[in-house]
Amino acid sequence: LAWGDSRIGNVLYQDFRPVAVLDWEMACVGPRELDVAWIIFAHMVFQELAGLAGLPGLPDVMREQDVRATYETLTGRALGDLRWFYVYSGVIWCVVFMRTGARRVRFGEIERPGDVESLFYHGSLLRRLLDGPDEGVA
């Protein structure tokens, strides 16, 4: 079972310990790499947004090597290559940004963009990912 929307914003904490996980509408049967890549990629998206806002973000948080090591230590299971799952996550984030952009247009918050890709705030991240594994994505 894959959670589907594994990210820090969907976890409730009490005394710095997770006590509940929320937002299960993307749950599905899938490999563990789906959720692991999603949580890392979600952080990369927010890191990209921080950069667009001129902020440093948290570049030392949710690094693949750290998440992978922690996951493997806690579960005793090795993870496979996450690249395909990052691309998948990037495409799903495109859908999310298109939907939120359409809603903003509908309610008059923004003008309809001439190029829908301008709504992909993580576009440069996705392009780097598609360009190849040595482009500094993870």
Residue ranges with predicted function:
Residues 1-4, 21-23, 40, 86, ...:
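Short beta-strand segments
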Residues 103-138:
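Regulatory N- and C-terminal appendages and interdomain linkers associated
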Residues 17-19, 78-79, 133-138:
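Conserved NTP-binding catalytic cores of kinases and kinase-like/nucleotidyltransferase enzymes
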Residues 77-89:
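All-alpha amphipathic helical-bundle segments outside canonical DNA-binding/catalytic cores
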Residues 28-31, 56-59, 114, 118:
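Pocket-edge positions in alpha/beta enzyme catalytic cores
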Residues 1-34:
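Active-site acidic catalytic loop and adjacent metal/ATP-binding pocket
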Residues 18-22, 63-77, 121-127:
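Short amphipathic alpha-helical segments and their helix-coil junctions
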Residues 34-75, 89-107:
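Active-site activation/catalytic loop segments of kinase-like enzymes and analogous catalytic loops
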